[in-house]
C-alpha cells in the first residue's frame, strides 16, 4: 500500500499496488507545467488508486490543441494523480508519502525535448 498527498494535505490518496518504476517526462509541456526539468510519475491502473479525501479540491486543465491534461490541488497548486489514459493513472512520484521505498527511475521519455541545462546521469 502506498499513500500520497498534495503539499497542503487537502488531497490525499492510497494506491493498492507495489510501486517500482518511475517515468520521467522531459517534454516542453511537462517542463512548463512544473517549472522544472519535467515530471516524474508512477503509472498505476485506475482501479488501484483510491481518493481518501479532497477529490473535490482537484482541478483539471487541458492544454488547447494538445493531447495533454494536468490535475492539481485548487488550494496549494501541487500536481496530483490524473488520467491521460482511460486505464491508467499518472501519479506524481514526489507526492508519495509512504510506499515509495522501491521506486527507481526506469525510463526517461521525450529526452529530445529536454531543457538545454538538464543533464541525465547514469546514477
Model regions: which residues?
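A short Gly-Trp-Pro
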Residues: 1-123
